[in-house]
Amino acid sequence: LTGLFLAMHYTSDIATAFSSVAHICRDVNYGWLIRNIHANGASFFFICIYLHIGRGLYYGSYLYKETWNVGVVLLLLVMMTAFVG
C-alpha cells in the first residue's frame, strides 16, 4: 500500500529520480513517514521470510524436494521483484 503512494510521486528517469525522492520527503504530506514505513515494512517482510525458511530447515522440510524448490523459486522471485521495484 505504501508503495502505491510512493509511486504516485516517484519518477524513474535518471535526471529526476533523486529530486523526486527529495520531493516525497519534503513536499508530500507525511511523505517522510510513508517512505520510512515502506522501508521498515519491507525489512520486516524479509525477516518473516527468513524465519519461515529457518523453520523449514529446523523441521526438515527440505526433504520434500518439489515443495522446497517451489519455495526457493518464490523466494528468488520476491527478491527480484523487491530489487527491481
Curated annotation (Swiss-Prot):
Transmembrane segments: 1-8, 32-53, 68-85
Needed co-factor(s): heme b
Cofactor: binding comment: Binds 2 heme b groups non-covalently.
GO molecular function, one term: metal ion binding
Residues bound to heme b b566: 52
Keyword Membrane: yes
Matches recorded under Pfam families: Cytochrome_B
UniProt key word Heme: yes
Binding site for heme b b562: 38
Annotated localization: Mitochondrion inner membrane
One GO BP annotation of this record: mitochondrial electron transport, ubiquinol to cytochrome c
Keywords: Electron transport, Heme, Iron, Membrane, Metal-binding, Mitochondrion, Mitochondrion inner membrane, Respiratory chain, Transmembrane, Transmembrane helix, Transport, Ubiquinone
GO CC field: mitochondrial inner membrane
InterPro entries linked: Cyt_b/b6_N (IPR005797), Cytb/b6-like_sf (IPR027387), Di-haem_cyt_TM (IPR016174)
Assembly mode: The cytochrome bc1 complex contains 3 respiratory subunits (MT-CYB, CYC1 and UQCRFS1), 2 core proteins (UQCRC1 and UQCRC2) and probably 6 low-molecular weight proteins.
Extra facts: Heme 1 (or BL or b562) is low-potential and absorbs at about 562 nm, and heme 2 (or BH or b566) is high-potential and absorbs at about 566 nm.
Function statement: Component of the ubiquinol-cytochrome c reductase complex (complex III or cytochrome b-c1 complex) that is part of the mitochondrial respiratory chain. The b-c1 complex mediates electron transfer from ubiquinol to cytochrome c. Contributes to the generation of a proton gradient across the mitochondrial membrane that is then used for ATP synthesis.
Protein name: Cytochrome b
